[in-house]
Amino acid sequence: MLFNEFCKIIEKIENTPKRLEKIDYFVEIIDFVKNHGKPENLKEICQVSIGRVFAEYENREIGIGPNLLIEAIKTTGISENDLNLKIKETGDIGISVEHLSSKIKQISLFNEPLTFEEVYSTIKKLSTIEGTSSQKKKIRIISNLLIIANPIESRYISRLILEDMRIGMNIPTILAAFSNYFGIEKEKIEKVYAVTNDIGLIGKKLLENSNFEEDPELNLTVFRPIKPMLAQLTPSIEEAVIEMKNPQFETKYDGARVQVHKSNGEVKIYSRRLEDITNSVPELVLEIKNLEVDNVILEGECVAMNLENGKPRPFQDILRRFRRKYDIDKMTEEVSLRIYFFDILYHNKGLIDLPLFERRNILENIFGTNNWDLELKKIENEIKSNKMLFTSFKVSSTDLKIAKEFFKWSLSIGHEGIMVKNLNAIYTPGSRVKTMCKIKQTLENLDVVVTRAKIGMGKRKDWYGSYEISVKGDDESLHVIGNVGSGLTEEDLEKLTKIANEIKIEDLGGEVILEPKIVLEVTYEEIQTSEKYEMGYALRFPRVVGIREDKSINDINSLDDVKKIYEIERKRK
């Protein structure tokens, strides 16, 4: 497939704001590939259309920011001054290169047209270049590609290198196109995506005319992590009991969600962003290897522990462990970790369609029980032990008095609150479900994404000192909810400034517009209505709790979350 043909279709997708038209244009791509390409092309096109070169679970990125791309563009014959002026005018490196493409020095008039496979494989190769002179090699590869490209191709090559296609395509839109073209119920395709986390693989398999629902590659598989099921926020235990009908209460741990995969003695541990953190937590890996059970996918919360008092250490200690690449043994001695497992998703076969009470029974056959109402003495002894692997503390009851006592106890041992789960519920990957909710004593912190940064004043004059923060809407749009600068140390500011300079899209002089990649966890005094922002709400006195490197834009809170927290707090007042 010629890359120019692909570009012409995705330009139509980019130019229409209407979702149904985007679906129709993507159907056009599927049909073109079916008649003129091969299934592997559709796999790659699906990834490229959502601004990714690799599947999300592969935990790989091209790793090239705007600054390095600009350096490469300058070697093609476009002057730095012209490029900067055009970027300031358009706010888009891709369109800027397209507009200035007449200034690119062409190698030859007799170049063969670029194919999609050629562009994709070349850009994919960029992620493998490491070591000395790696930047020079990357610049040379990008430059050679742009010199061969025609104007529209240069736009999308530049964007793909940044893994930001800006055409308004997302997973649900592609799944809808699959449903339309192949005549398969959208719900069935959505379920397959939930257990594969690989939109490209689904497209490839559909074109291969495989038995879609029976194909083993499209089932839940060990070492291919899936997105976690997410909980709703509920204002009170009373409402949770009514909502859940058949409730199980579990401690809500002050930790980080992890997914543990084990098969044939090999163990991998993934963060909630599906990042492979196995090498950072060797002591946990060894404990899991020693378990008799094999061929499993387990889900739990990883907690940094103070073993002297049995209480959790600050959340940032977990991130320090997850990020550590060197001196891991030393860090293992400094920060003790344990995992509280609360679900099992796979044991020789997928278990996510089983009700929670059955999955919990299977889990407890591996790790033992931790029934708070029956085994409190054992639990309190184990909390202060060196044991690393537990089942989550739980109590199954509709008795409000017991539930409230369990909530207070969970807070007393240093954790955030409780989870309330419907024992009859199945596991739905990647969805925020009504069959699971969380109850916390304090205001729910928000995970937000940084969309702009401003140069600071006084002691902060050398860094970006203030950050515009946003939450997501239903259509994946971003809504500004405030600006934050408090809570950040000098070390944080230095780190954020470095990242911001790597991902800035436009420099406005003292302020930069950023790719939405930095996730912050913020606390605040309250959520208030506000005419200042389009969404109608603003955070009063926001303060940064932490830089959430374990989360992506997919994990940030939504406008609906903000509305719900606002209503909960209004009722409490």
Curated annotation (Swiss-Prot):
Its EC number is 6.5.1.1. The keyword Transmembrane does not apply. GO terms for biological process: cell division; DNA biosynthetic process; DNA recombination; DNA repair; lagging strand elongation. GO terms for molecular function: ATP binding; DNA binding; DNA ligase (ATP) activity; metal ion binding. Coiled coil: none annotated. The active site is at K252. Its cofactor is Mg(2+). PROSITE patterns: DNA_LIGASE_A1, DNA_LIGASE_A2, DNA_LIGASE_A3. It catalyses: ATP + (deoxyribonucleotide)n-3'-hydroxyl + 5'-phospho-(deoxyribonucleotide)m = (deoxyribonucleotide)n+m + AMP + diphosphate. It is an enzyme of class 6 (ligase). It holds the Pfam family DNA_ligase_A_M. It comes from the Archaea. InterPro entries: ATP-dep_DNA_ligase (IPR050191), DNA_ligae_ATP-dep_bac/arc (IPR022865), DNA_ligase_ATP-dep (IPR000977), DNA_ligase_ATP-dep_C (IPR012309), DNA_ligase_ATP-dep_cent (IPR012310), DNA_ligase_ATP-dep_CS (IPR016059), DNA_ligase_ATP-dep_N (IPR012308), DNA_ligase_N_sf (IPR036599). ATP binds at E250, R257, R272, E301, F342, R432, K438. The keyword Magnesium applies. Keywords: ATP-binding, Cell cycle, Cell division, DNA damage, DNA recombination, DNA repair, DNA replication, Ligase, Magnesium, Metal-binding, Nucleotide-binding. Belongs to the ATP-dependent DNA ligase family. DNA ligase that seals nicks in double-stranded DNA during DNA replication, DNA recombination and DNA repair. This is DNA ligase. It comes from Methanococcus vannielii (strain ATCC 35089 / DSM 1224 / JCM 13029 / OCM 148 / SB). The lineage of its organism: Archaea, Methanobacteriati, Methanobacteriota, Methanomada group, Methanococci.
